[in-house]
Amino acid sequence: IDVLKMKYYHFKDDNGTREDLDIPANLMDEAETLRQELIEKAAEFDDTLMERFFENGSLTEDEIREGLGIGIRQGGVLPVFCLSGKKDIGVKRLMEFTIKTAISPAETKSVTKDGNVVECKVENPTSIFIYKTDVEPHLGEVSYFKVMSGHLTEGMDLENPETGDKERLSAIYAVAGAKKEKVTGLQAGEIGCTVKLRAGKTNVTLSQLGSGIAYEHIVFPASKYRCAIKAESQNDETKLGEALSKISAQDPTIIVEYSKELKQTILSGQGEQHINVC
């Protein structure tokens, strides 16, 4: 039941096919109560909306969206959605709400390591933050990033401001799930990926030459479980080393180190199950 639109959604199959129906009579009282609570919450964050609520006893759908949007921006509203990505149930509704009500990338600001505020605007110097690294067949190492500011174009030269290393992005891809589409550019607020970077790994900022923009690193949880690992045979040691290198690149919470005292390769992670899955 969607108490914002006051509709009952029925999903016929596992392909996300949705049928919009009237709310059943036996559920209407509960739905109206929840909608009233939603209206009151939306009105809390704006004086004009509060006045309309007192005058009319209710708010329109657009006014509710406006109030919820203000609440999200102030940190007073944390929307929760029930959905299934596997069966594509509720995903479309989540996307609708995100587009119409949630914060636009253009409204966000990021703070650099120096404490400077960088707005997510196309006219600002270009900067990207790499939040994930993957190793994929036929592509090799793939770096996923968000364009934090400016306009990224194919062939653009960027630098890692922390090391001074230069990087040319020869290929840029827009990402939609597992699908990648080669594009000539991306602008502030968009997410994309590129391949085979030298100066850019997970948690690294690449920014316009001379801009000095470097964002704070993601703080990953410390490892809680350690175990020794070895190859089944001496011939497999090279393969094991390559596999461990790929795993640690994809998952920064996996740490691989060699203990001189124990003369063993030590693998650290969040728990036994975490290590087993890797």
Residues of each region from the PLM?
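Structural and coupling elements of P-loop NTPases
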Residues: 1-278
